UniProtKB/Swiss-Prot annotation:
One of its GO terms (cellular component) is plasma membrane. Residues 1-530, 587-602, 670-707, 781-1544, 1617-1620, 1710-1715, 1812-1819, 1878-1884, 1950-1976 are cytoplasmic. The lineage of its organism: Eukaryota, Viridiplantae, Streptophyta, Embryophyta, Tracheophyta. The gene is CALS8. It is found in: Cell membrane. The keyword Cell membrane applies. This is Putative callose synthase 8.
């Protein structure tokens, strides 16, 4: 053919008109009778609009979208081809859904048919051939020729590569259409998408590796390691013949064989094929390279992968005592093939397992059987049972593995998850992922069989009508496991249905496995019983010692004291008995799956515990003070050794503990015993712990063990010394005094007057101390965490470069540090130790073996600075000041430092030289002392020389310039510069040089304008003449030598005649054609850059000392520089580095801010306005980069998209995260370039080489693709595409912008099966091609994946599309930086470091919180989070060895985790904090988690109080669920004692300590309330003289430590001190207190304790979306009330009432100072809990806003609720939702709730006896009469409410009279009582304090018993009363706000402390707040 196809613009051949019938099946087609037929009405004009190919019905999109896209692509040049493609799409759609039952199918068919009718006649006329078949062949062959002609080219640029890809896509689609038309098979044959694509010649969509024939010429396929890996996978020699599997062609590779053998999906096979090839290639390249060892490296790579993939499987087999089924032949080549097949089989199982991936041992079970079948198939083994060849039980059929293996187990998981009832059901009622997986830890799992027996108990799912006797229990029945044809499988609508017949009697629900998650605070004791027993026994010992007044530890060995102390073992026995009872109670519901030996052991242990509980007390009581003594000859404190029978018993009792102690000191032996499967060791370990698959062998090395043991010994010694001296010992004497006092006259009716020793008073005094005793270890941990974390940071060079000044001072060491850390070393350099930290590097030099090392640093530095400019952190001027010139001089070691280092240095040198008097050597040393000054002087001199050499071209002028230069250099050599030159004239010369260079710069800009150029030429000549005269006349002492040269020229001219002398030009002046200076200068970028740099060197002043001005740029540069001095692994070459992926889950969060969102002002100020004020410098830089002056100019220039990006990159958006993570790819390409490029390429520049050197650029892309993959799991992308959501387009735009980005999503669509729509789910991976999303892989799922917490399943479905050996988890509100991405290959080398016994499996990274720069709350939150992710995790990793996974930027050993359950857990509710469970799981499975501080990732946090509180609530909920989880229980039981302490205090212990610190306040206050109201306090003061108890003051002080946030405050200050300096840290800490940080932390304490405690008791944990809004906005009063009413306001009022009552009735003999100290923190807490939401609410004291809030509050409180009314609209709806946690509560939790509510009745009981009206009567009748008053009050309230219902609408006047009557009656009663019974005003106040808590207590009790009273009038009255209470509390809270709002100064003060950080940065907060008020 003579015409060439251009793919973007399809072929244009002169058209010839032919007539043609409508395309359809041929006449002889069997489908003709049933095919679609319709007459088309022809029209004359074709539509110019492309048909919408994106919004298609979900049921059809995957099958027809490619045809419609290609039609749109070729329509302009080949309209008939477009028509045929659309008609073909229509036929497929009609065949798939003939009755149009799918959603949207009918509409789609109608619109497409209309388009076909419109296009038919016009396209026939435009047809160029006689028939449609010929037309198709013509275009198809044209594209085919283009592909053949250009497909082999290797050096295509991007545009040519895109054209070739488009050509392949078009040819592939045309091939399908042509094949259908010519074969006449009808659309039925083409409906199977996969089979047609398999036949396509040209284009198969691929992810990274184009494994089809068309991809062999791509650069990545030419890498030797890829070729080797492909060869391994394609080695099909020796496989069974394909005919055995109904295949007529040889197998393409091993994966195709596995697919046909076991029935895997095509998409899964294609995905895992590429997966394994990439894994193999990356492993091969890292093998030691030897000559002729390519096959050997392949063997070693496969062996390495085998070891990683099957480590868990082989351990599982060993644990169960089964031989593994990985059987290898002896022939080496065959063994390699077998190994590859086993790895491929596991990957295919894993890739299709869907939610079963959370169950790793379930996958082991499946693989175990399939590996056996695979071996049988490969060897041709014959079954002993059937006598036939071994065949896969589930093989052969289409998708048979999914249907027959995965789906039955998935259905069990799904049905069990449904029983969770959205988190309200008790955990014991359903099996979660762990329960189902742990069933495979026992040999009983093999009873399931293979093929699996559907009647097995494992598949039995309890009915939803739970567990009533005789109830039918449902069981999932699955179809019989037989091979079926594809059609039969498609006809099966249900893979599992509930059997309608009664199951067999033996079928039963197995219940929980190994553990039951029970909601109880006892779970904390059970999980950490050793710790609690230790603290209880220590407390008992300390009390005994205090009673004996022990002052020295040696006194304990006094016989009597020692014997008393030994009584602690009686307590120990009791505690073990309690533990044994709890174990049986808590595991009762797991008894069905518990081995019989385990049941026996539990009973035996309980029996032994009961026996010791009896024996020890009996022996102790009988042998007390009865000793048998022995005397020794040693004169020591052991000179007399006495013992008793009790001591002998204790010795026997402690035998087991002694063995544990010995094993503790030899961790290797204990680890071997735990992990060994030998029978003896099984027996030895059987008694201690239940034999579980996980939790064994977690011991650390002796060095690590010593470090954390030493840490905890210090903590415990400090804690016990403090507790003994300040808490316990001071309490002994007051206790004895209290016990001696006899109380006769109580001030109330004492219920137990006969109790001796004032036991209640002793409890009231001791209880707060006990609470603090159990809590204050957390405080001491925080103190030592600060000390050790700070010491560790100093030793690891943290904060070595903190400021710009320090950066400038150390900048000369950065090149050497950079090359030592980030540049791969040659073989010679690998042995050389890198210099670190405090030792200087070679100034500006790399290693001797790499002369270009400095050039590499310069190139990377400039890339980093350019990225700053791209991100608008710096301006164009700052860019010039910070970049370093890259020229050939760098290779010779001449360094040209960035100008911001040299700022003011040259002018300072001039000032020094100008007035200097002395010798040259002294001046030289003075200038040389400042290296940057020396470099500045030297560079200015060399630059001036260089410019003059180019500028001056006249012979005489050149001689003069050379003469001057020679004079200068000669004087320097002879040290006579000060003698030969007058330095005083240097400033004048400086000014003239500036003038000269400015003219040169101006000339280069104006060189196109001739007239302007001539004018500048004249000025330039004059400037040169001025310089010449200044130097020769004023500066040079012997300037006459230079003048002689000039005069000699003039003298030589006399011989030529007077005429010639007259016309001779002046020096530097041009005449005619003769030019003395070359101006304009040559058009050279490097020359222009050098002139510009010279000008900056001459002109830049002190202002450049603050470059860069942007704070974030400063921080990033400082950290990057500091990290170069930290200990990090050597960098490998990119080709040898570990490959990795990044995975980001995304739900419905912002991707990019839309234009409307940017400018919308509905709820507050617009986002763009906010951004302009918060980031003013970055906005200015952005405008400069865009070349615009303001926002309006941007809009006029059409740069709205750039504006959207700029704003989105400053919010918490997905686009920001994607941009940051794609820096990893950019960094890898640059590093690969540095690895491969020669010196000339480096000097040319990375970007220039990438554009010009296509083969090198293709190779860089190939390496980057092989090493890095980024997958974003957009859960809703499919639904968004279908609905036309703009978010879908935003995601597509991201893929187009970053071509290597991949998006995974779940598609839910309806498929028509037997004319019935059925929901089917697919996991899909897409990429962007030609502006559209193109599907790469499609894997069918067994059902909806989101049956758990959501986010883990979102990660789980996408993890199969990730690649590499490592996986980094990144949230969508994170950021990354180019300079940090350079360190990724160093970080990945950590996996190859073996620290201790195990290599790391999770690498922890530090985070920078980037949202703390504006509001004070955001500042507090960022500092709090920063301290946790730095100093906190630093200590957790080393020395404590208990760092887990906390989400965000951690890097996983990918293969380790995909074979052990994934990177998170997903069971509903219990795994609410899904991330941390990955860390628990890793630790329990003997993984190792480290923390690395040399690399950081950005992280966003919430910035408003409400958002922060929701986040805190979510974390507290998650921690409460962790408390009752099996993971925490096993860690607590399996760790050694000191590591267990670390685990507790760094996980749930922090929250439990916070809870008991608050409980301690309640105990103290209620204890004091008891003492005051009962009259005991008065008696104790008067008779026992008990006044101030120091221990109580200590207890309250300890509580205040937690309350005021010092647990996080101390580490925070230390970390700030390390990174910014301790003076700044102290200043920040003081400033935080002035900004009410104590209020914030006290308020946060209330949030944590409320949600932690409530969730443990009642459940109700749920994910709480915070919104992550970028704008800090005002929250209205009703919103604050809903959020904080029950968590803070109620408790705040309760504390305040307690304090008021105590203040009213306390006895004044107490010291006022002591009382103030004790109660201050409580007053502060109550005030904070009531007021903080309003103090931290922007514009919270603005009158206009206050008025609006009051209206909204009244509307909300009065609105009636109902079905569908949200809680933000109605008080009643909110009130009902607020009790949701009680609906799923058990009887025990409800009873405890009632018991806790009884505390509100204490007020009434105590206060009624202190009324004047009672006249000191303490009879119980007084209390009874008080209830009469309460009932009368309730009756009155009910009467008024009833009257409102009856009369308020129609008989309003009657209702008013009724209210007047009630009011008068109450007033009359009060007056009567005042006159007759002496009722006083104080009585009325006290009555309110007494009766209000009682009413609230009744409401709480009614809520607890709601199921019993709901629907009765009592419940209706409860609602009325609760509304009244809420209204009253709202009024009390609102009144002070309204009063303060009248004072303008309050609002100004609030704005100042809320936004102080912004004021410090001079940001414009007032316009933002003003904008908010305006837009309300």
């Amino acid at each position: 053919m003579s015409h060439e196809i251009v793919p973007v613009d399809p072929i244009d051949v002169p058209s010839t008109s032919y007539s043609r019938p409508i395309l359809g099946p041929r006449e002889d087609s069997p489908e003709r009778a049933t095919e679609f037929t319709r007459s088309l009405t022809f029209r004359e004009h074709v539509s110019s609009e492309p048909f919408d190919s994106e919004r298609l019905p979900a049921t059809l999109a995957s099958e027809i979208q490619r045809f419609l896209r290609i039609a749109n692509l070729v329509e302009s040049e080949e309209p008939r081809i477009a028509y045929l493609c659309r008609f073909h799409a229509f036929e497929i759609a009609h065949h798939m859904d003939r009755n149009s039952t799918g959603r949207g199918v009918r509409q789609f068919k109608t619109s497409l048919l209309q388009r076909l009718e419109l296009d038919e006649e016009f396209t026939v006329r435009r047809r160029k051939e006689k028939s449609d078949v010929r037309e198709l062949k013509r275009v198809y062959h044209a594209y085919k020729e283009y592909i053949i002609r250009h497909g082999a080219a290797f050096n295509l640029d991007n545009s040519q590569r895109e054209k070739l890809i488009n050509a392949r896509r078009i040819a592939s689609v045309l091939y399908e259409v042509l094949k259908t038309v010519t074969s006449g098979a009808g659309p039925q044959a083409i409906a199977d998408r996969e089979s047609i694509r398999a036949k396509s010649e040209f284009y198969v969509p691929y992810n990274i590796l184009p494994l089809d024939k068309g991809g062999v010429h791509q650069a990545i396929m030419h890498l030797p390691e890829i070729k080797a890996a492909v060869a391994i996978v394609r080695n099909t020699r020796g496989l069974p013949p394909p005919e055995e599997f109904q295949r007529h062609q040889p197998f393409l590779d091993l994966f195709e064989f596995l697919q046909y053998a076991f029935g895997f999906q095509n998409g899964n096979v294609a995905n895992q094929r590429e997966h394994l090839i990439l894994l193999l290639s990356n492993t091969i390249i890292r093998q030691p390279q030897k000559q002729s060892s390519a096959p050997k490296s392949g063997d070693e790579a496969v062996d390495a992968l085998m070891k990683k993939f099957f480590k868990n499987y082989t351990n599982w087999c060993k644990f169960l005592g089964r031989k593994n089924n990985i059987r290898l032949p002896y022939v080496k080549q065959e063994a390699l093939q077998y190994k590859t097949l086993y790895i491929g089989l596991y990957l295919l199982i894993w890739g299709e397992a869907s939610n079963l991936r959370f169950m790793p041992e379930c996958l082991c079970y499946i693989f175990h059987h399939m590996a056996y079948e695979l071996h049988g198939v490969l060897t041709g083994a014959v079954s002993m049972i059937t006598g036939e060849k071994v065949a896969p039980a589930y093989g052969g059929g289409h998708e048979s593995f999914l249907a027959d293996v995965v789906t039955p187990i998935y259905m069990v998981v799904q049905k069990e998850a449904e029983k969770n009832k959205n988190g309200t059901a008790d955990h014991s009622m359903w099996r979660n992922y762990d329960d189902l997986n742990e069933f495979f830890w026992s040999l009983e799992c093999f009873e399931i069989g293979w093929p699996m027996r559907p009647e097995h108990d494992f598949f039995c799912v309890e009915s939803s009508e739970t567990s009533k006797p005789g109830r039918w229990r449902g069981m999932l029945r699955f179809r019989k496991q037989t091979k079926k044809t594809d059609e039969e499988i498609e006809d099966d609508e249900e893979l599992g249905v509930l059997s309608e017949e009664q199951p067999k009697p033996t079928s039963r629900w197995l219940g929980k496995t190994n553990f039951v998650e029970t909601r109880s605070f006892w779970q904390i004791f059970r999980s950490f019983d050793r710790m609690w027993s230790f603290f209880v026994l220590s407390l008992q010992a300390l009390i005994i010692m205090a009673c004996h007044d022990v002052g020295s530890p040696l006194q304990v060995f006094n016989a009597n004291i020692f014997e008393d102390v030994m009584s602690i073992f009686i307590t120990s026995a009791i505690l073990k008995l309690i533990k044994g009872i709890l174990d049986i109670i808590f595991k009762w519901k797991a008894r069905n799956t518990m081995p019989i030996n385990e049941k026996k052991k539990r009973l035996v242990k309980l029996g032994f515990a009961a026996m010791w509980t009896i024996i020890l007390p009996v022996l102790y009581s009988h042998s007390r003070r009865k000793y048998i003594c022995y005397f020794t000859n040693y004169k020591t404190w052991l000179g007399e050794w006495c013992f008793s029978p009790y001591m002998v018993a204790v010795t026997i009792y402690l035998t087991g503990s002694a063995i544990e102690l010995v094993l503790f000191f030899v961790p290797a032996i204990s680890k071997y015993i735990e992990t060994s499967n030998h029978g003896i060791f099984k027996t030895l370990s059987w008694w201690g712990q239940p034999r579980l698959y996980v939790g064994r062998g977690m011991q650390e090395t002796q060095v690590s063990q010593f470090k954390y043991t030493f840490f905890w010994i210090l903590v415990l010694l400090t804690k016990f010394a403090f507790s003994y001296a300040f808490e316990i010992k001071p309490l002994i004497e007051p206790t004895r005094l209290i016990m001696k006092v006899g109380v006769r006259n109580y001030e109330w009716h004492e219920i137990f007057p006969e109790v001796k020793s004032n036991a209640a008073a002793i409890v009231a005094v001791w209880a707060p101390i006990m609470v603090v005793y159990f809590m204050d270890t957390q405080i001491w941990y925080s103190v030592y965490c600060t000390i050790f974390g700070g010491l560790y940071g100093v030793l690891h060079h943290l904060g070595e470069i903190r400021t710009l000044g320090m950066l400038r001072g150390r900048f000369h060491t950065l090149p050497s540090a950079f090359n030592a850390s980030l540049i791969p070393h040659s073989t010679k350099d690998e042995k050389r130790r890198k210099q670190r930290g405090f030792f200087p590097f070679n100034l500006g030099r790399g290693s001797d073996g790499q002369k270009n090392s400095m050039a590499k640093f310069v190139l990377v530095w400039n890339q980093v600075i350019n990225s700053f400019r791209t991100e608008d952190l710096i301006s164009n001027k700052e860019l010039d000041l910070m970049t370093m010139p890259l020229s050939s001089e760098v290779l010779s070691g001449i360094i040209r430092w960035p100008i911001f280092l040299l700022a003011n240095k040259f002018s300072t040198a001039l000032s020094i030289a100008k007035d200097f008097v002395g010798k040259d050597e002294v001046l030289y040393r003075r200038i040389r002392k400042d290296e940057y000054m020396y470099y500045a002087v030297k560079e200015c001199y060399e630059s001036l020389k260089y410019i003059l050499q180019i500028l001056v071209v006249g012979d005489l002028e050149k001689k003069i310039i050379s003469g001057i230069i020679n004079e200068i250099e000669e004087s320097i050599r002879q040290s006579s510069l000060l003698e030969e030159f007058k330095m005083a004239e240097l400033p004048a010369l400086h000014d003239k040089c500036i003038e000269l260079v400015q003219l040169l710069v101006e000339g280069s800009a104006e060189q196109l304008q001739v007239e302007k150029s001539e004018e500048l030429h004249g000025k330039l000549v004059k400037a040169l003449q001025d310089i010449f005269e200044l130097v020769t006349n004023d500066m040079m002492v012997h300037g006459d030598r230079i003048l002689d040269l000039l005069q000699s020229r003039e003298g030589s001219g006399e011989d030529t005649g007077i005429f010639m002398r007259v016309i001779e030009p002046q020096l530097f002046e041009s005449y005619g054609e003769w030019r003395c200076i070359h101006f304009p200068l040559p058009d050279s970028a490097s020359l222009s850059e050098q002139i510009q740099r010279f000008l900056l060197l001459l002109t830049v002043k002190d202002s450049a000392m603050d470059i860069p001005e942007n704070l974030d740029a400063r921080r990033r540069l400082s950290f990057f520089a500091t990290s170069l001095f930290m200990d990090m692994p050597d960098a490998p070459k990119v080709r040898n580095m570990m490959s990795f992926s990044v995975l980001t889950p995304h739900y419905q969060e912002d991707i990019n801010y839309s234009t409307n969102e940017l400018h919308s002002t509905k709820s507050s100020v617009s986002i763009i306005f906010y951004m302009q004020k918060i980031f003013p410098d970055e906005w200015k830089n952005f405008l400069e980069r865009m070349g615009c002056d303001n926002l309006d100019a941007l809009k006029k220039e059409g740069k709205e998209e750039e504006l959207r990006n700029w704003a989105s990159f400053r919010g918490q958006t997905l686009s920001r995260t994607v941009r940051g993570m794609m820096y990893c790819r950019e960094a890898l390409k640059l590093q690969a370039f540095l690895d491969m490029a020669d010196d000339e390429d480096i000097l040319e520049g990375y970007k220039d080489v990438e554009r010009s050197n296509r083969p090198l650029a293709a190779q860089l892309d190939a390496l980057a693709d092989m090493k890095f993959t980024y997958v974003v799991s957009c859960q809703m992308f499919g639904a968004q595409k279908s609905s036309g959501d703009p978010h879908a387009q935003d995601i597509l735009d991201l893929m187009i912008k970053y071509p290597s980005l991949r998006v995974a999503y779940v598609e839910e669509r309806e498929e028509i099966v037997l004319d019935v729509p059925k929901k089917v789910y697919y996991s899909i991976l897409v990429k962007a091609v030609n502006g559209f999303d193109q599907e790469i892989y499609r894997v069918k799922l067994p059902g909806p994946p989101n049956i758990g917490e959501g986010k883990p399943e979102n990660q789980n479905h996408a993890i199969v599309f990730t690649r590499g050996e490592a996986l980094q988890t990144i949230d969508m509100n994170q950021d990354h930086y180019l300079e940090e991405a350079f360190k990724m290959r160093n970080l990945l080398q950590e996996f190859l470091r073996n620290r201790g016994r195990r290599p790391p499996t999770i690498l922890g990274l530090r985070e920078h919180i980037f949202t703390g720069s504006v509001s004070s709350l955001a500042w507090f939150m960022s500092y709090q989070e920063t301290s946790f992710v730095t100093i906190g995790q630093r200590l957790l990793a080393n020395p404590l060895r208990v760092r887990f996974h906390y989400g965000h930027p951690d890097v996983f050993d990918r293969i380790f985790h995909i074979t052990r359950g994934g990177i998170s857990k997903s069971s509903r509710t219990i795994n609410l904090s899904e991330d941390v469970f990955a860390g628990y799981n890793t630790t329990l499975r003997r993984g190792c988690i480290t923390y690395n501080e040399y690399l950081q990732v950005g992280k966003g946090r919430d910035v408003g109080l409400n958002q922060i509180s929701k986040f805190e609530a979510k974390v507290a909920n998650g921690n409460s669920e962790q408390t009752i989880s099996r993971d925490i229980y096993r860690l607590g039981q399996r760790f050694d004692f000191f590591r267990m302490l670390s685990c507790y205090f760094t996980t749930i212990g922090f929250y439990f300590s916070s809870l008991i610190s608050v409980i301690g306040i309640y105990i103290y206050l209620y204890g004091q309330l008891y003492l005051v109201l009962s009259g005991l306090q008065k008696t104790l003061i008067l008779e026992a003289k008990v006044k101030n108890i120091k221990s109580l003051e200590t207890a309250l002080a300890s509580q205040s430590f937690i309350q005021l946030g010092l647990l996080t405050g101390l580490p925070m200050v230390m970390e700030i001190g390390l990174e910014k300096g301790f003076l700044i840290a102290f200043q920040d800490f003081i400033l935080m207190q002035l900004q009410l940080a104590a209020f914030f932390f006290t308020f946060s304490l209330g949030t944590k304790t409320h949600y932690f405690g409530r969730t443990i008791l009642h459940g109700g944990a749920k994910y709480r979306p915070t919104g992550r809004k970028v704008v800090v906005f005002h929250a209205n009063f009703s919103e604050n009330y809903r959020l904080y009413s029950r968590s803070h306001f109620i408790k705040g009022f309760e504390l305040m009432i307690l304090l008021v009552v105590y203040e009213l009735f306390k006895h004044t003999s107490q010291s006022n100072m002591a009382y103030s100290f004790i109660t201050f923190s409580v007053w502060f807490m109550s005030f904070t809990w009531l007021c903080a939401p309003f103090l931290f609410n922007p514009s919270g004291f603005t009158w206009e806003i206050i008025v609006g809030d009051w209206r909204d509050w009244n509307r909300w409180i009065k609105e009636q609720g109902g079905i569908g009314i949200q809680q933000d609209k109605s008080w009643q709806s909110w009130w009902n939702d607020e009790q949701a946690h009680l609906r799923g509560s058990g009887v025990g939790a409800r009873c405890l709730e009632i018991i806790l509510s009884l505390r509100f009745f204490v007020y009434q009981y105590g206060l009624v006896y202190h009324l004047d009206i009672t006249q000191s009567n303490t009879n119980i009748i007084v209390y009874a009469l008080s209830w009469v008053v309460i009932l009368a009050t309730f009756f009155t309230v009910k009467a008024v409410d009833l009257g409102r219902q009856l009369f308020s609408t129609r008989k309003h006047l009657v209702f008013r009279f009724f209210k007047v009557f009630v009011f008068v009656s109450i007033l009359t009663i009060i007056i009567t009582l005042a006159n007759i019974c002496h009722l006083s005003v104080k009585d009325l106040l006290v009555s309110c304090l007494a009766f209000l808590p009682t009413g609230w207590g009744l409401i709480l009790i009614a809520q607890a018993v709601r199921p019993k009273i709901e629907g009765t009038s009592l419940w209706e009255f409860t609602q009325v009363l609760a509304r009244a209470y809420d209204y009253g509390m709202g009024v009390v809270l609102f009144a002070p706000m309204a009063i303060l709002a009248w004072l303008p100064i309050i609002s100004a003060f609030q704005t100042r402390f809320l936004f102080n950080e912004a004021f410090n940065r001079r940001l414009q907060i007032q316009p933002i707040l003003a904008g908010k008020k305006k837009n309300r």
